[in-house]
C-alpha cells in the first residue's frame, strides 16, 4: 500500500551557532538550548527526545512536532519536505 503524509504545519528554526538562532530556538520552546563546543570548529546542538539525545549540526533545521517534541532534520531533507507556510497562504489567496 502507498501512503501520503497528512498536510501538517510545523514550526522550525535553522540551527546556526549565533545568538539570534539560539534565541529563536528558545522562543520555539526548546528548553534547555544545549550547544556543545567539545569541537570548537564544529559546535553541535544536543536535543533531548523520547529516544535519547539527538545531535544537530550547524545548518540543520530543528523542528517542533505536532505533540511539542523537537528533532533535527538535515537541510536537504527539510527543503524537499517542507515549504514556507506564509508564502503558501499568500499564493492560495490569489
Locate the predicted segments by residue.
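Short, compact, well-ordered microdomains
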Residues: 51-94
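N-terminal domain-onset segments
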Residues: 1-50
Amino acid at each position: 500500500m502507498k501512503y501520503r503524509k497528512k498536510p501538517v504545519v510545523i514550526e522550525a528554526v535553522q540551527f546556526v551557532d549565533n545568538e539570534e538562532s539560539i534565541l529563536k530556538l528558545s522562543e520555539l520552546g526548546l528548553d534547555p538550548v544545549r550547544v556543545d563546543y567539545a569541537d570548537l570548529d564544529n559546535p553541535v546542538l544536543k536535543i533531548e527526545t523520547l529516544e535519547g539525545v539527538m545531535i544537530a549540526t550547524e545548518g540543520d533545521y530543528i523542528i517542533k512536532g505536532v505533540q511539542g517534541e523537537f528533532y533535527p532534520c538535515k537541510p536537504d531533507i527539510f527543503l524537499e519536505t517542507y515549504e514556507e507556510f506564509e508564502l503558501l497562504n499568500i499564493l492560495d489567496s490569489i
